[in-house]
Amino acid sequence: MITKLLTKVIGSRNDRTLRRLRKIVKEINNYEPTFEALSDEELKAKTVEFRERLEQGETLDKLLPEAFATVREASKRVYGMRHFDVQLIGGMVLNAGQIAEMRTGEGKTLTATLPAYLNALPGKGVHVVTVNDYLAKRDAETNRPLFEFLGMTVGVNVPNMPPQAKKEAYQADILYGTNNEFGFDYLRDNMAFRNEDRVQRERFFAVVDEVDSILIDEARTPLIISGPAEDSSELYTRINLLIPHLQKQDKEDSEEYRGDGHYTVDEKSKQVHLTETGQEYVEELLVKNGLMEEGDTLYSPANISLLHHVNAALRAHVLFERNVDYIVNDDGEVVIVDEHTGRTMPGRRWSEGLHQAVEAKEGVKIQNENQTLASITFQNYFRLYEKLSGMTGTADTEAFEFQSIYGLETVVIPTNKPMIRNDMPDVVYRTEAEKFAAIIEDIKERVAKGQPTLVGTVSIEKSELLSNALKKAKIKHNVLNAKFHEKEAEIVAEAGMPGAVTIATNMAGRGTDIVLGGSWQAKVESLQDPTKEQIDAIKAEWKKVHDQVLDAGGLHIIGTERHESRRIDNQLRGRSGRQGDAGSSRFYLSMEDSLLRIFTSDRMASLIQSGMEEGEAIESKMLSRSIEKAQRKVEGRNFDIRKQLLEYDDVANDQRKVVYELRDELMNVDDISDMIEQNREDVLTAIIDEYIPPQSLEDMWDVEGLQERLKADFDLDAPIKQWLEEDDKLYEEALREKIISLAVEVYKAKEEVVGAQVLRNFEKSVMLQTLDTLWKEHLAAMDHLRQGIHLRGYAQKNPKQEYKRESFELFEGLLEALKTDVITVLSRVRVQQQEEVERMEEQRRAQAEEAARRAQAQHAAAENQLADGEESEGSNQPVVRDERKVGRNEPCPCGSGKKYKQCHGQIN
């Protein structure tokens, strides 16, 4: 009560922020007459002037009013568009490293030009981050004329660019790109072996468009660069055949109850578990199919891989649905559908064998499993920026999460014109069929009035279901979902036409406004070199249609189901009522919808259904509150999952920082001999201590063992026995120094032969390669640790603490292994004379030619045999090999250095 009273008197925090910013808006507006009087050249010269003032110590905040006034004036001259005062406020919020919540149609793209220009002045680069390639290219091309007018360069960062083009793009003052590509470039840079192969420079300032989508919806998705692991496609196929034999059990097993089903499904957490009966039955099937030994159990350490395959296959069949979670494209590939945007994500694959299990289920080609080479979450990537800001139409519901995880405050920016959209209360039906019938009736009414309608669905399957119903009712419509997103811009351009009906999944043309009366720009673009008269005629025609749509009630939004997040519902509603236009929205629900089925109480469900007749709908504030409560519950749970993910990933992130800093150090110095020398001393000391314990008696020394170990691991012939015989006063400390000195001496001799520079380059290369290999193995070990850590809870231990402790031990092991492996390689490397190298190279070439000739002859013989179509007389004689058979994993005799199976073994 007191809080409400105080808010009334002094205003909310948001109101106070807006009041403060409006004072600066007045300051910017005061510059307008002066800047209007400047010539184009004088206005362009402002950029140089601002940069000079920055060098003299002026701050960006001090320059802000003039810089914003410069951009506004340039925009008027280049586009004929003047930034509204609310856009100036939005620009200031972004510059302060905060989140600006701006409604759809309020011009977020133009707003971003203000802080982008200001923060590009120091020359460190600004990244404007969008959700897809189309928006990155569109926004870059839209804003390029404005920035180039002001003397700034603009770049685009999208997938599959040549390395040099990407490097040049990163040198631009303002770079537009997708969140995925920025993250992957960071990972790729940290896998590069030469500085010139890196593309990114420092991460100074980022403006994230659709910030809720990137930092919240996708926060749980790590970016992973992976390489192929071993092939196990046959196992996926064989286990896939077992899953249809399993039966679902509705209730979990407990002490009092043991069902006869084989698995249970937890819809809330999207998990599937084998029951005890299921485990026994699966074991029986595996034994029968020769995949497991009789009497063995699925949970024995030797069968971990089998368990992994069974779980993946079970999840693929039970939890993942075609045309909802994924589609199978024309090339027979399983392509993931983003649950938040409804877009397909080509190139992305589920991990932990799930993708292969889905491929086996669909009967398409099974790709190899992958091994993680480098990984980071969006949460951790974007926290690397010195200053981070974001824009979205819907952030207020997640303001707490932005603040607690990213330290970003959300400021709600007022609309330029008051919002007059009519948001009608939800209507609930008993069944989905009744709900769809009501939606069709509503659409018919709107079409008859000439009112455009956008229907939002939660999946491709639902959008196609509704599309079929509309076809039966003979209602012309467009479908915008992951299957047709190439036509997205075209469909969105027509969605505001009188009587147009558009069905869309969550993607709902996000980032693209639905303009009432259709897009006149699209019509102009379809003409070749249009004249001014043609453009004026198109605009006049558009104005007529625009007014006609407004009279019919503007864009009507129909939601066919509530989403798990209120924010996504608000995004759908936000498509209508842009810039003060008329509009309306309504959600149609049924008791069969997943949100109502899973999250509303049984009492509420039976209460609703008991008083309802077929086709009858219920509208009630109590019900709307109950639905909102269910959504809050889901949002809370998802927030906890993301927070927990971050806490676990923070552990890996700290380790990632150490490894990448070490990599940076290695990349930026030419001489790491001091580091190598220190590592050699540490490694040899540790080994000597194993065989000659500190402060021990000579009887406890294992001299022979030490000599053998030094020879085997470091190719070091240390005559320790002889030294001890020659000097009976040689104690452990002096002996240690003598061994280390000998190792240094031997290494120096190699340096004299090959030259210091060659050896320095070799040291650096070995160190980088070893670090990358160990980091890759460490990531796999961390994955395994993470997957099983929750079981520690059963032993009354805190899983999070245990994870931190064990991952730290693993990391210490990595650092120790790095030292040992590098010193081992450097010690065992043999230096050969040039003549010897040339002789070996000649020998290798001759072997390669001989192997190629032999392979060619075999190939020709095989072709001849096929061409003849019949066996020759002696074809049934056994082939006698006149040389030793080469093993698959042995080096190829051609001398390529590859394994036989990966070289000429493939031909054979």
Swiss-Prot record:
One of its GO terms (cellular component) is plasma membrane. It catalyses: ATP + H2O + cellular proteinSide 1 = ADP + phosphate + cellular proteinSide 2. One of its GO terms (molecular function) is protein-exporting ATPase activity. InterPro entries: Helicase_ATP-bd, Helicase_C-like, P-loop_NTPase, SEC_C_motif, SecA, SecA_CS, SecA_DEAD, SecA_motor_DEAD. Residues 834-908 are annotated as: Disordered. Zn(2+) binds at C892, C894, C903, H904. ATP binds at Q87, G105, E106, G107, K108, T109, D513. CDD domains: DEXDc_SecA (cd17928), SF2_C_secA (cd18803). Residues 836-853 have a biased composition (Basic and acidic residues). GO terms for biological process: intracellular protein transmembrane transport; protein import; protein targeting; protein transport by the Sec complex. It is a peripheral membrane protein. It is found in: Cell inner membrane; Cytoplasm. May bind 1 zinc ion per subunit. Residues 854-863 have a biased composition (Low complexity). Pfam families: P-loop_SecA, SEC-C, SecA_DEAD, SecA_PP_bind, SecA_SW. Keywords: ATP-binding, Cell inner membrane, Cell membrane, Cytoplasm, Membrane, Metal-binding, Nucleotide-binding, Protein transport, Translocase, Translocation, Transport, Zinc. Its cofactor is Zn(2+). Monomer and homodimer. Part of the essential Sec protein translocation apparatus which comprises SecA, SecYEG and auxiliary proteins SecDF-YajC and YidC. Belongs to the SecA family. This is Protein translocase subunit SecA. The lineage of its organism: Bacteria, Pseudomonadati, Pseudomonadota, Gammaproteobacteria, Vibrionales.
